[in-house]
Amino acid sequence: MQLNDLRSAPGARREKLRPGRGIGSGLGKTGGRGHKGQTSRSGGKIAPGFEGGQQPLHRRLPKFGFTSLKALDRAEIRTSELAKVEGDVVTLQALKDANLVNQGVRRVKVMLSGDVGRAVTLKGIAVTKGARAAIEAAGGKIED
């Protein structure tokens, strides 16, 4: 006996239903589609979300929100993340090289969150009042 000689025992597997192929199948004549109406016809589907002429839910609810285009080229970083930048001078390009901000970012602001690990010099980067105090307390400076 080979693998290709193996067969299931008779009656072990149920035959596939073939709608519309005689009354003996249990799905003859209408083939399980019922009588008349849109869904009994071929191609008789209704669009997802269609509620029979009633105003659909997605049109009853109001629109809301928008995506600010300013958010696409601006970013915020924490004071604790400044330690991840190589060297003592932190510029926009240095932040991009350290993967702290995306490549498309054009403006960055440093927020006070965590401690500044070492003295760093910020060039061309905006800072909050608290972050400025923390950076200067650590011996760093901010240049515009």
From Swiss-Prot:
It comes from the Bacteria. Keywords: Ribonucleoprotein, Ribosomal protein, RNA-binding, rRNA-binding. One of its GO terms (molecular function) is structural constituent of ribosome. The lineage of its organism: Bacteria, Pseudomonadati, Pseudomonadota, Gammaproteobacteria, Pseudomonadales. Part of the 50S ribosomal subunit. It holds the Pfam family Ribosomal_L27A. Disulfide bonds: none annotated. InterPro entries: Ribosomal_uL15 (IPR030878), Ribosomal_uL15/eL18 (IPR021131), Ribosomal_uL15/eL18_sf (IPR036227), Ribosomal_uL15_bac-type (IPR005749), Ribosomal_uL15_CS (IPR001196). Belongs to the universal ribosomal protein uL15 family. HAMAP family: Ribosomal_uL15. Coiled coil: none annotated. GO terms for biological process: translation. Gene3D superfamilies: 3.100.10.10. Residues 21-31 have a biased composition (Gly residues). One of its GO terms (cellular component) is cytosolic large ribosomal subunit. This is Large ribosomal subunit protein uL15. It comes from Azotobacter vinelandii (strain DJ / ATCC BAA-1303). Binds to the 23S rRNA. Residues 1-58 are annotated as: Disordered.
